[in-house]
């Protein structure tokens, strides 16, 4: 009887597994350690609370600015909506223009010869270097910020589309042509599916660059947005607001990355696991 009980207990132990992967567990543990160190340093006042407020103060301030009181004549959600609107408009423009441009460059040596030097000339330059020029040409309104973010996203998207077209397997293209497929059918059913993983990877890279460019642009030329909140709070030495908004910026960037990874897994399941 005791042997049967021991076997059942042993089988239950074998069946139970830690629900999270090793990587996720390590990530959560790292964040927990960082928060513990932060809380300890703040509790012992090793650094002045003016420069490093405790986590609970930052959380309380985050809840405050998310409420009706807000910050700088707008709530956190209004600032967040302004930032997300800019990044979404710039991303849509980069997708609508960048992907066709990249595909055209991959299919036509003439188009590539015309556009490749232009993209390669401006691509290495940090996007913020163009900000003064954008402000001079378009003022400090929405156009300058959206155009700056668009420039940051466009190059990775276009070049990834170009790389995706170049990586299309010639065997599949010839097989489709031998079966009587037209050029449009080859493009739509062979080249585009083969290029899609590269295009989505370029979108992930471009969105990351665009998000950082957005926040930096709002630090300089904006009256609403997450970057504007950080800049304004820094001028008043409101460190708790600065840290709260930085946390929001990091969380939004993380969620955008997770969303694009999920989209990539769904649209390109044959490409293997997205890292």
Task: Identify what each model region corresponds to.
Residues 59, 73, 77, 81, ...:
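Alpha-helical membrane-protein architecture signal
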Residues 89-119:
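Transmembrane-helix boundary motif in ABC transporter permease subunits
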Residues 147, 151, 183-217, 244, ...:
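Transmembrane alpha-helices
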Residues 1-32, 258-275:
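Transmembrane alpha-helical segments of polytopic membrane transport and secretion proteins
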Residues 227-262:
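Hydrophobic alpha-helical transmembrane segments of polytopic membrane proteins
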Residues 120-156, 163-164:
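Generic hydrophobic transmembrane alpha-helix motif, especially the helices
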